[in-house]
């Protein structure tokens, strides 16, 4: 199977998304949205600098294939990147498994929409596999991480692994450009606190108080992922 030919309403939706991304890149999300949608932009999602919009698609209208086409579109028009990081969120584990299989299957229409843009160097993985992608591959190949929304809900104590300090990310963070981690300050659970160190039976965190965690969430945040 190759890339599906998009229906007219699907292409229209992507064209609108591309127009917004291009305008947001030069004018900012709020002004771009106001000009294109004719109503005020809602800043509640990610603030004034990071664009957040919804596409209205009918039930059964091919939202997944649109998402696959939206990744290279937004990477090009908003980020100007040919090796983006995208976090693909779904509402349940069953849908996560289904989506992951499709995006990893050669020839599947969803994967084809991505490989048409990025070739077979495309990396599609789960949260558990992020640390296995070699540090030099970030920024050189497109990376799509498929996860459930619940994995990032910080109030869910059972789902906080993405924010936990993990030594498996040591080579990633130690190789990060100097000063690049300043952007992590102020993000939820991004920095090791004195309380964290006191609760750490291993003693590892004592030397990291006030510094960004070596965590999955922080590593993704460093790469300004499409969401």
Where are these regions (language model features)?
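RecA-like P-loop NTPase motor core of helicase/translocase proteins
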Residues: 1-227
């Amino acid at each position: 199977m190759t890339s599906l030919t998009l229906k007219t309403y699907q292409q229209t939706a992507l064209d609108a998304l591309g127009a917004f991304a291009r305008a947001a890149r030069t004018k900012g999300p709020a002004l771009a949205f106001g000009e294109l949608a004719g109503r005020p932009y809602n800043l509640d999602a990610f603030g004034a600098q990071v664009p957040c919009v919804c596409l209205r698609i009918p039930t059964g209208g091919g939202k997944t294939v649109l998402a696959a086409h939206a990744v290279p579109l937004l990477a090009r028009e908003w980020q100007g990147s040919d090796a983006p990081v995208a976090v693909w969120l779904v509402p349940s584990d069953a849908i996560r498994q289904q989506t992951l299989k499709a995006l990893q299957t050669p020839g599947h229409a969803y994967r084809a929409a991505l490989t048409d843009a990025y070739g077979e160097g495309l990396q599609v993985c789960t949260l558990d596999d992020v640390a296995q992608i070699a540090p030099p591959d970030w920024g050189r190949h497109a990376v799509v991480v498929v996860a459930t929304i619940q994995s990032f809900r910080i109030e869910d104590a059972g789902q906080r692994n993405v924010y936990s300090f993990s030594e498996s990310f040591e080579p990633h963070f130690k190789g990060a450009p100097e000063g690049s981690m300043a952007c992590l300050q102020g993000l939820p659970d991004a920095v090791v606190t004195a309380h964290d160190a006191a609760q750490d039976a291993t003693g590892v965190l004592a030397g990291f108080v006030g510094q960004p965690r070596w965590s999955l969430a922080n590593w993704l945040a460093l790469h300004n992922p499409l969401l």
